Amino acid sequence: MIHHMKLHQEPFESIKKGVKTIELRLYDEKRQVLKSGDMIDFTSPHGERICVKVVKLHIFNSFQELYERLPLDKCGYDDVSQAKPEDMEMYYSKAEQAKYGVVGIEIALFDP
């Protein structure tokens, strides 16, 4: 199955370069249908597209738990010492996180 998601330019470029291999999202209805082996078509703000394969889903109750368990350099942080779960509150409220949980989507560039 192919899923479509939007990305800000910086994480888009990091995925394109193969540096970021875990995308962090709310585990809402849209992400709950993801499965290993599915494809994600990411679109940047400039309309660029990149296709990746879902390798594994890492599901947690909160970004706090996710940040303690996953390698943050693979989640898009250049300086992991500055990484904090509160960074994700600019995208997802604490109420949304409590309602749905969160997911680290482990991905690999897709080369057809």
Where are these regions (language model features)?
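Beta-strand secondary-structure signal
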Residues: 4, 53, 104-106
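Contiguous surface segments at macromolecular interaction interfaces
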Residues: 14, 66-112
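Short beta-strand-centered aromatic/proline hotspots
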Residues: 49-59
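Compositionally biased, charged N-terminal/linker segments
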Residues: 1-34
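A generic structural motif
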Residues: 58-61, 111
